[in-house]
């Protein structure tokens, strides 16, 4: 992640045909656009899985509009480009992640109605908010006066990451006193999704207010967020899928005191806000200025263990039958003991679900034994954070010279601070953990400085909630 400071000045002319049809096409988009977020956009960690269908379905191009609506569940990509080649703006301010180059759709998850007003463009198309990147761009309009007056309640169910979703949106429209207010709430939930061991718990909110002072000036403010907690599924090997007799096998969870517990849990919350000033200087000249803020808090948990502890992952290669001997190698002749062990491990994998999943109780027992001997905690659960603090500013001046010519001048300033660290989430019943590289200890011993994660605070004792391992900022 790095700080990006960009100043963009764009001067271009609109052809008579584009200019004459601009207003009509904008109205057609608002009336007929079908804007669809895929499940991958709202829920996946891997931003590379995000598709471009979010913007193409709001585009007035016949081809893009149709494929965006019809193929969005299939993660349609314009010309095969990944999502880092597409830009997403809110009130004219770029909100793409500086590190990945992609827009985080999780920040507006569950806010379908609040993000319905938008303008989409294809590659290098003429527009009033940005250069057209090769993957296209979308500008979401969150000004309160742009929402139709009224209320809407929707309930839906599915059998994917979550099973129930509720959304409520209310808008006053533009009142006689020049004020407009819009609010939206959403909730998505699943005790367990279609993948065993996963769960979903997400709340979302949106609040917007706007004051129209007169025909020339208006000020608007909007804030939104979607705090989310969800259990992840994990990829495994074809051998594990075969033994589990399911390609939905998920090695990330296990039983703890008879209850399912997922080791890979995502906690994400990206509270954001944007303020906009619209100044219609006259009929020919317009100035739109916006300033945005985003604080991204994203953490994903994972199991950790010392170099002297057995690997707790159930699908670790040494726990699979293939580690005993290679059944596909005809030159391999197993001994009777190897064959018996192979059959025994295969049978356990096929018949015992506990064999295929994480053994939480065993990890707690191992740590309790280490406590009794005054030794280091063997197993723990860490949370890896990739947080951001971002400020964005945009000012766009549009001048229509005559019926055939116009130009746009824009200024954009973006700055981001990235905060990367991990913290101790759960010691799993352990008492003692020292901030050193446990695998380096095996090679260099406890007396070597090489094992220290923090040379300024050597051998620092770590408790739950403390940062350890690494902690750095990138500006």
Positions of predicted regions on the chain:
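Extracytoplasmic beta-strand/coil segments of soluble accessory domains associated
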Residues: 53-94, 123
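Short acidic/polar hinge/loop motifs at secondary-structure boundaries
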Residues: 55, 64, 93-124, 141-143, ...
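Hydrophobic, lipid-facing positions within transmembrane beta-strands of outer-membrane proteins
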Residues: 74, 134-136, 164-168, 203-207, ...
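Outer-membrane beta-barrel transmembrane strands
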Residues: 81, 259-302, 376-414, 419-420, ...
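Outer-membrane beta-barrel transmembrane domain signature of Gram-negative proteins
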Residues: 148-171, 413-475
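Transmembrane beta-strands of outer-membrane beta-barrel proteins
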Residues: 149-153, 179-183, 219-221, 287-291, ...
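Transmembrane beta-barrel wall of Gram-negative outer-membrane proteins
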Residues: 157-190, 194-233, 265, 271-281
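Acidic/polar loop-and-plug regions of large Gram-negative outer-membrane beta-barrel proteins
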Residues: 218-276, 299-382, 445-460
